From Swiss-Prot:
GO terms for biological process: carbohydrate metabolic process; pentose-phosphate shunt. The gene is tal. Pathway: Carbohydrate degradation; pentose phosphate pathway; D-glyceraldehyde 3-phosphate and beta-D-fructose 6-phosphate from D-ribose 5-phosphate and D-xylulose 5-phosphate (non-oxidative stage): step 2/3. It comes from Frankia alni (strain DSM 45986 / CECT 9034 / ACN14a). PANTHER family: TRANSALDOLASE. One of its GO terms (molecular function) is transaldolase activity. This is Transaldolase. InterPro entries: Aldolase_TIM (IPR013785), TAL/FSA (IPR001585), Transaldolase_2 (IPR004732), Transaldolase_AS (IPR018225). HAMAP family: Transaldolase_2. Pfam families: TAL_FSA (PF00923). It catalyses: D-sedoheptulose 7-phosphate + D-glyceraldehyde 3-phosphate = D-erythrose 4-phosphate + beta-D-fructose 6-phosphate. It is found in: Cytoplasm. Its EC number is 2.2.1.2. Gene3D superfamilies: Aldolase class I.
Length: 371
């Protein structure tokens, strides 16, 4: 009997779960997914936490304790999310140890309202690193223009980073540079970088959602023929840049000092278009040294009927370039698409964060978002 998730892992794709909740932790569901579904990492974001806390009674005891202590809403959010992430880190500690620190990682995002404030982002990253106090933690920092120096400085301080909200190829180049600069600075400071890790989270399905809407407005046969092709082409060309960047003398010098490469991570891999196969953003993005983080529905769908037919990225670089040429020919401004998606991405996480603050404030018996 085939095991698609095991086959995916054997092809060099690390399977991560894009979800966390206290229910999932306390019922043993996460441990079961690690044991039986090849899951070797976890990602979270403000939207995931907002839904988890709003829909569960398992946070009530901690909320009562926080209320008695009189903590503010922001501190309460940090305490609650850090507790879940710490517990998930412990569930995955065996994976972390067995993989030499490559996998077994759990991600916790900085306050998304700091997306354009580098110094405060670094301070928040440091505080969360101290609060969770687990070596297999990733701090998530968005790849905004202002986020880039924060990524470098956080890594330079010896804190592992998941760079999130990457949509475009040029920004991905800048993320790789920020990563390498951070590793270089960490080495200059005398740090052991053998356990300093990073992933670059490239968002997939949202690209198709935005581009396909524009193609529908254009409405020509040429435009319609490009439907659902951009996101995969974009991710494939990102992997090509990854291969080139991590074959340079600059990287080889860092690797010789024990540094691990920053792996590409495919995020936003659930299909938003019901006409598409529900595993398309997994099966079409298979290459060694990558991570695919999936919501549980996508994970279980791939376990049920996913197919691994060898590599599906490197053989298709020329096809991907042709997609981008065709997009330009029909009038899609890909730079505007990327800028729109980054703005929307930051705003969505800010909105979820504010909802989360509101949920916690209500539970604590006070109003406002004084986080």
């Amino acid at each position: 009997m085939s095991n698609p998730l095991s086959e995916l892992s054997a092809a060099g794709v690390a399977v991560w779960l894009d979800d966390i909740s206290r229910d999932r932790l306390r019922t043993g569901n996460l441990a079961d997914l690690v044991a039986n579904r090849s899951v070797v990492g976890v990602t979270s974001n403000p939207t995931i936490f907002q839904k988890a806390i709003a829909s569960s009674d398992l946070y009530n005891e901690q909320l009562r304790d926080l209320k008695v202590r009189g903590v503010d809403v922001g501190e309460a959010v940090r305490a609650i999310t850090a507790a879940d992430v710490r517990e998930a880190c412990d569930v995955l500690r065996g994976v972390y140890d067995a993989s030499g620190g490559v996998d077994g990682r759990v991600s916790l995002e900085v306050d998304p309202r700091l997306a354009h404030e580098a110094e405060r982002t670094v301070a928040e990253a440091r505080a969360l690193w101290w609060l969770v106090d687990r070596p297999n933690l990733f701090i998530k920092i968005p790849a905004t223009q202002d986020g880039l120096p924060a990524i470098t400085e956080t890594l330079a301080q010896g804190i592992s980073v998941n760079v999130t909200l990457i949509f475009g190829l040029d920004r991905y180049d800048a993320v790789i540079d920020a990563f390498m600069s951070g590793v270089e600075q960490a080495i200059e400071a005398g740090r052991d970088v053998s356990d300093l890790a990073s992933v670059a989270s490239f968002f997939v399905s949202r690209v198709d959602s935005e581009v396909d809407a524009r193609l529908d407005k254009i409405g020509t046969p040429e435009a319609k023929a490009l439907h659902a092709k951009t996101a995969i082409a974009n991710a494939r060309l990102a992997y090509e840049r990854y291969e080139k960047a991590f074959a340079t003398p600059r990287w080889k010098a860092l690797a010789a000092k024990g540094a691990k490469p920053q792996r590409p991570l495919w995020a936003s891999t659930s299909t938003k278009d019901p006409s598409l196969p529900d595993t398309i953003y997994v099966s079409e993005l298979i290459a060694p040294g990558t991570v695919n983080t999936m919501p549980e529905a996508t994970l279980q769908a791939f376990a049920d009927h996913g197919q691994v037919k060898g590599e599906t990225i490197r053989p298709h670089y020329d096809d991907a370039r042709q997609v981008f040429a065709a997009l330009a020919a029909v009038g899609v401004d890909i730079d505007d698409v990327i800028e729109t998606l980054e703005t929307q991405g930051v705003q969505k996480f800010e909105d979820s964060w504010n909802q989360l603050l509101g949920t916690i404030a209500q539970q604590l018996g006070r109003s406002g978002t004084d986080g």
